[in-house]
């Protein structure tokens, strides 16, 4: 069996390479650029798809939303009778339906001329 293997190996090393193993030459520079851009766009699309499915924000659980009265009460527009935890930080202590404007530090506020 080993003699047969050595004979086949010897024949394969003696045979010249096939013509299809020789390259035809480099691609044109514009074709290389086009292929590089296409590969880059495919990789970016894959990254966006992975980011979309991997980093999805889970919906807020229902037990964290507290109902405080009916819609006729003075709650934030769009909350439909649900208490918003964001509103607690700027509610006014003077009136239950009033909100205070919280002053921002000068460095955090960005303004652009109109």
Swiss-Prot record:
PTM sites of type Phosphoserine: 85
Highest taxon of the lineage: Eukaryota
Membrane topology category: Single-pass membrane protein
Pfam families: MAP17
Keyword Transmembrane attributed: yes
InterPro entries on file: PDZK1IP1/SMIM24
Family of this protein: Belongs to the PDZK1-interacting protein 1/SMIM24 family.
Official protein name in the record: PDZK1-interacting protein 1
């Amino acid at each position: 069996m080993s003699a047969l293997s050595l004979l086949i190996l010897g024949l394969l090393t003696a045979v010249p390479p096939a013509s299809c193993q020789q390259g035809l030459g480099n691609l044109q520079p514009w074709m290389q650029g086009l292929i590089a851009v296409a590969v880059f766009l495919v990789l970016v699309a894959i990254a966006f798809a992975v980011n979309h499915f991997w980093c999805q924000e889970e919906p807020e659980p229902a037990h964290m939303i507290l109902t405080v009265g009916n819609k006729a009460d003075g709650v934030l527009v769009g909350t439909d009778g649900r208490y918003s935890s964001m509103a607690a930080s700027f509610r006014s202590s003077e009136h239950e339906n009033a909100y205070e404007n919280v002053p921002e530090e000068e460095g955090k506020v960005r303004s652009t001329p109109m």
